[in-house]
Amino acid sequence: MVGIFNIVIDEENFKVLDSSLHFEVEAGLMYPSVSVVSWMGLANVFEAGMNASILILPKDAFGNNISFSGKKMEFQEFSLSLISENGSFAGVLNSTHIRWIVSGYISIDFVLVTSGKFLLLVEKESQTLNGGPLPLEVNSGPLDVSNCVSIWKSELSTWQIFSKMEILLHQKDRFGNIVSGFYEFDADVVEVETGLSIPVADFQFEYVEPGIQLMSFTLSEPGNFLLTLSDMKHNKSISSMPYVYTVYIGYCDGSRSIVNGSGINASIAGESLGFSVYLKDAYGYPSPVQVDRLQVRIVLEIDSSIILPTIQPREALNGTGSSHQAATPLYEKHGGRASGNLVTQASIFDVTYTPKRTGIYRIFISSGNIVLNGGQPFIKEVYAGEVNVAACSVTQFNGKVPKEIKNEIVVLLLDGFYNPVPSQPSRLKFEITSANTSSFTTWEFVDNNDGTYTGSYLAMEVGTYRMCISFDNKHIQPCPFDVNVYSNGYFPRAYDDPVNVWEDESISFNPLENDYFAGDNASMLGFSQPGHGSLLRDGNLLRYTPMKNFSGNDSFLYTIADINGNLAAATVYIFVLTAPPQFVSFSGGLQATEDLISPRYGGFSGLEISYSDLLENISVMVQALSGSVILSPMLMQFRPPGSGKLSVSNGGEDRRVLILEGQVGVINPALQSIQYLGNENFAGVDSLRLSTKNKNGINHLDVPVFVEPVNDPPFINVPQYIMLESNGSESLIFHPERDKFNFSVGDPDLVNFPGGESHFLVTFSLEVTDGFLLTNLPSELINSTELKFKNLFQWQPIQTYAAISKHVNVKASGIRFRGTIRQCNDLMQQLLHRGGENGAVLTLKLSDMGNYGCFLDCTERISLPLHAEARVNLIRKRPLSSLGAHGTFMKYLVVVPFSFFSIKLFSLLMVLIG
């Protein structure tokens, strides 16, 4: 990574903290296979003759961008070449302009002149740039008539009368590219002797292939003619016009003519061969022609090389025999006759030739434009001759080999014309000329079917062995040659190395660590370039950095040499592990509302993962620490076929972990549908734990969830009635030992109140309809305490009081104060009631004073106060007589649920009965 970095020095014991040191890291040298090549403007379709431009983003071995601002750079080391669709080499491109542009790219301009679909290969230092090869399509330019080419089906300019002349007209632009489309051309035939234009009735132009027309017409008159194809409107003729041709009177029939002789059969290289040609008409009669109109072309299939034959016409004698012409004409290449005034006619020809190279030959024979053998060539094969030992050689052997290891020797057998000779393994033999032969084992030679033979041997003992290879007891050079056999420990052994590295990371390793070499001293001679990363060397240490976003397998070869110059090679197999999916987009915090599913519609936006392998199944686990995570119904989505299915489940001990499984293409939409519901009455900051997992590991991300509080009403837990002493004395109202009930007040917002319990204030009031309430209040509550007395309906603050041990005794029919929940509950635990012998009703009221939970800012989180109210029937027990106990008990059971008037009525009845 490049940039300016600070060094922070922190020492806790001596309280040292210094961050004043910094350093700068600059990009290294350009590494071709990491640098990125692309088309300028993303355009890759051009017309021939247009200027094309590519952009190169130079990077170092670690993927850092290189800036050449103010620095010199060698631009000429880039090579541009075209590869055709079938993978063959199509040519080298010459750059016309190379420059450095401000955006950080190198721009290379070049001109494209060859049409077709190609791959552009951009290389530097024999390394292909990343992103290449680039697809490229070049369309042909406009038609250039003067550059069009005509190709005759017959290579001779002589045509037999009544033949159909056929010419393939190739439409081309100015660069020689085929131009598609049907274009009109003008044809004109002129007789040479008269200079007059000859009318042709059946001129035909047929579009046979893209950019190729077939022009044809019938030759109905003998003589010498000129043919011109042109565009008369623009006064332009196609190239090589006019075409001079001769029409002669002849009746040769290619299918009835005969070719026979050993020269068209298989033969041995160097043999003189021959065959005879008998020209016949359609009725089988001899059809003589001028001898210069017979053409024989012998082509070697492998490289299209030509053999020049000798053609001799044979003269018929009174129909009973034949004799050869005295003069033997000379021929040009392709079997064409040299210029001369030969006018001899013949129908029988003898052809001789000598093939010296082995392979498949094609023999084309034609009389003028009439091709024999039905228009097809004769096929023959030439085999190698007898082995010429003087031309043979031992081409491969190793002068230093380990003992007890099978080693190989390669021998090349050639004939007298240096053709490889196959199928002769049994005639090859090993000959050991040294004295030590008892511990030496040989195997038969194996034919490699290309003239080479592989022989194997094994030496059990250390020493020098002198040997020869013989063919039919004749020694093949070099002979003898020495092979030195050493113990196995003499030679180095390189072992393959497996290396694991995370994608987008780098790893340094020494491939020689597990290799063996004598003397504990070896050096690395070199290494090949990996296909998907960079490789830097520091001594015997290599540092591999995969290309950005690449994961999978990579490899390279390396070669070592020991102190004796012995070599060994091995392969480093690199496994670039796909890192667990990373979150490329996530919110700094999610917003939610207490006790509500958030968001209300859809899910949280901004949660997205990236993963380099689009087809691998991965999983994402989502869990809230103080809540639950659910998946909202997702909208209908159209995904490409093969994108996989989404699996949704719950896991964990409490089944509160939402698990999404599938390919990254289906998980990302699901992440956009996640909803949150906090625990009951929870408000504050929660954490959403997102865990992404693949086959190589797991990655965690904690996203805060800010749960906005909602003001919950306070609550009062009291029973409907409480039984007190009947004599009207002081009685503890809420007695936990007497009444098994949780007497308490509270507020759900208190649990998550950030200011703590001491700052969560409420207003608590208690009023009794008869008698007095007595309690002992802490002195800090005096300022907020108000009292209500009998027959007074207003709350009054405490005017005078006497504090004992920071507490004040209070006696009134009503008490109201502002305090904490704990202080309210403490008051309830010590609240006394006096008087009211006939019972009373205690009313409890609790107000949260609008506390909204105060999250995050109490000044902005205040709402209208919420209240809780409860009434408790305080019943004074009276001793019952044995006579009225049963009835009294029943009345007691009936009146308990009623209100204050019911209690008064109950008391009156008790007095009357008593």
Curated annotation (Swiss-Prot):
A GO BP annotation: fusion of sperm to egg plasma membrane involved in double fertilization forming a zygote and endosperm
InterPro entries registered for this protein in UniProt: Filamin, Filamin/ABP280_repeat-like, Filamin/ABP280_rpt, Ig-like_fold, Ig_E-set, Ig_GEX2_N
GO cellular component, one term: plasma membrane
Entry keyword Repeat: yes
GO molecular function annotation: actin filament binding
Cellular localization per UniProt: Cell membrane
Lipid bilayer topology: Single-pass membrane protein
Record keywords, A-Z: Cell membrane, Membrane, Repeat, Transmembrane, Transmembrane helix
Protein's UniProt keywords contain Repeat: yes
Gene3D superfamilies referenced in this protein's UniProt entry, alphabetically: 2.60.40.3440, Immunoglobulins (2.60.40.10)
Matching SUPFAM superfamilies: E set domains (SSF81296)
Entry's transmembrane regions: 893-913
Pfam families per UniProt: Big_9 (PF17963), Filamin (PF00630), Ig_GEX2_N (PF23616)
Superkingdom per UniProt: Eukaryota
Tissue/organ expression: In tricellular pollen, expressed in mature sperm cells but not in the vegetative cell. In bicellular pollen, detected in the progenitor generative cell. Detected in the egg cell within the female gametophyte.
Filamin repeat copies, ranges: 249-382, 391-485
Name used for this protein in its record: Protein GAMETE EXPRESSED 2
Organism in which the protein naturally occurs: Arabidopsis thaliana (Mouse-ear cress)
